[in-house]
């Protein structure tokens, strides 16, 4: 597709009759499947049957998407109260990761209790998978030309040595923008590598998941400061507030669980 003289990628991957299939959904789905593959491999190594994570994903993903959308709609209520028909339209984005995390954690706790397994063990195994899914999912924002930063020049983007297809996709309505999706995606990919390495350190149970929350939140805090489409509560960027909260809560949980003897088991213990 051409916008002016700048070639760009079409957000629609394929048209099935009257129904467009968007790259956003394909990319999100790919992230889920690769994350599931990573979790099932590690789960089997630690004695958790493959179908445990398959069942968890089948339940948690729809609920996480629902919570992600609800979270987004709540903080954009002025728009959606005037356009209620758009509340269920997620084909072009509008999913908030923090809302999805809330839904996923609630589902994971209830699922673990019902299956009689440790939630912290499931969370630790799933942590790299969740971050991998987030790293891949940001490319859905890229295809939708959303979640970008402030205005920049083409020369600035070329100075980052980015490939032309990224630079061109950051040209929106006659202006080039910061590719904040890319910054966060690269940060998340680096986090996946870190979490996979920390598996070998054999941390106390639950601490790999808290490390994920801390790592992701630090990156998200700084990237969010560059974005132009942040969900706001008065003068505050909600994602930055949530990021600070998650870092503080994670550190407190690590310290308190150790002092209370609730983190005696190690990552690889049954």
Swiss-Prot record:
GO biological process: lipoprotein biosynthetic process
Binding site for a 1,2-diacyl-sn-glycero-3-phospho-(1'-sn-glycerol): 138
Keyword Magnesium applies: no
Name of the top EC class for this enzyme: transferase
Listed pathway(s): Protein modification; lipoprotein biosynthesis (diacylglyceryl transfer)
Membrane-crossing segments per the record: 19-39, 56-76, 92-112, 116-136, 178-198, 206-226, 236-256
Domain of life: Bacteria
Any one Gene Ontology cellular component term annotated for this protein: plasma membrane
Alphabetical keyword list: Cell membrane, Membrane, Transferase, Transmembrane, Transmembrane helix
Main subcellular location: membrane
Locations listed in the record: Cell membrane
Molecular function via GO: phosphatidylglycerol-prolipoprotein diacylglyceryl transferase activity
Topology versus the membrane: Multi-pass membrane protein
EC number: 2.5.1.145
HAMAP family tied to this protein: Lgt
Family affiliation: Belongs to the Lgt family.
Role: Catalyzes the transfer of the diacylglyceryl group from phosphatidylglycerol to the sulfhydryl group of the N-terminal cysteine of a prolipoprotein, the first step in the formation of mature lipoproteins.
Protein name stated in the entry: Phosphatidylglycerol--prolipoprotein diacylglyceryl transferase
Organism the protein comes from: Bacillus cereus (strain 03BB102)
């Amino acid at each position: 597709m051409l916008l002016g003289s700048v070639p760009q990628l079409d957000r629609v991957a394929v048209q099935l009759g009257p129904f467009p299939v968007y790259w956003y959904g394909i990319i999100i789905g790919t992230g889920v499947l690769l994350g599931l593959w990573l979790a099932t491999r590690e789960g089997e190594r630690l004695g958790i049957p493959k179908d445990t994570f398959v069942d968890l994903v089948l339940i948690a993903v729809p609920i996480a998407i629902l919570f992600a959308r609800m979270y987004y709609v709540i903080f954009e209520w002025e728009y959606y109260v005037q356009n209620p028909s758009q509340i269920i339209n997620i084909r072009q984005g509008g999913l908030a990761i923090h809302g999805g995390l809330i839904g996923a954690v609630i589902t994971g706790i209830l699922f673990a209790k019902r299956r009689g397994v440790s939630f912290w063990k499931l969370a630790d195994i799933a942590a790299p998978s969740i971050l991998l899914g987030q790293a891949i999912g940001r490319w859905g924002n890229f295809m939708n030309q959303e979640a970008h930063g402030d205005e920049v020049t083409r020369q600035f983007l070329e100075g980052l040595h980015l490939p032309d297809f990224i630079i061109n996709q950051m040209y929106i309505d006659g202006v080039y923008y910061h590719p904040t999706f890319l910054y966060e995606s690269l940060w998340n990919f680096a986090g996946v590598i870190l979490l996979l390495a920390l598996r070998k350190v054999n941390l106390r149970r639950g601490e790999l998941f808290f490390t994920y929350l801390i790592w992701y939140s630090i990156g998200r805090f700084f990237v969010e400061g560059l974005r132009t489409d942040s969900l706001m509560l008065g003068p505050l960027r909600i994602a930055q507030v949530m990021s600070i909260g998650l870092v503080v809560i994670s550190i407190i949980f690590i310290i308190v669980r150790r002092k209370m003897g609730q983190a005696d088991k190690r990552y690889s213990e049954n």
